[in-house]
A protein has these predicted regions:
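ATP/NTP-dependent adenylation/nucleotidyl-transfer catalytic domains that generate, transfer
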Residues: 1-148
Length: 148
């Protein structure tokens, strides 16, 4: 779903794109998974993301992803969207979890419910995570990468 529906009833295009605001879903899903599931620091997530996404021809793609749906991202793009993710996730989203109604925990392994596995203060500040990302992830790709 998009943030703002199309204002023109004859237009099939939304007035605002969620992905233009928060970043590509595939990158943000990647960020969410590795930060919440493994607790990796932002620079490690950026490293993993770069190695997963910088070259379309490298590695295997799931069978259901057509070639025209495959995206590559350079380091600057990965860092930009990871910075937005870190700020939104750690600084401006946790209060929502403390205001949810009571309910059961369903499933395991990665729940973001305040009744489940994830515990974060509702008044958290993202400064530590943002500083770690900015200090340890360059703004552009290195001249060469180690083989592998």
């Amino acid at each position: 779903p998009e943030l703002v529906p199309a204002s023109d009833t004859h237009s099939s295009q939304p007035a605002q794109s969620t992905q233009a605001t928060i970043g590509p879903y595939e990158l943000q899903d990647f960020n969410l998974y590795f930060i919440t599931r493994y607790g990796f620091r932002p620079s490690k997530v950026a490293y993993l993301s770069y190695n997963a996404w910088h070259n379309i021809a490298r590695g295997a793609w799931p069978a259901g992803i057509r070639p025209d749906q495959r995206n590559a991202y350079d380091l600057a793009t990965i860092k930009r969207w990871l910075e937005i993710f870190v700020f939104r996730f750690f600084q401006i989203s946790q209060f929502k979890r403390s205001a949810v109604p009571n309910g059961p925990k369903v499933g395991s392994g990665g729940s973001l419910s305040p009744r489940g596995d994830w515990r974060a203060p509702s008044d958290a500040v993202a400064t530590a995570w943002l500083n770690e990302l900015r200090q340890h992830v360059p703004d552009r790709e290195p001249e060469s990468l180690p083989p592998g």
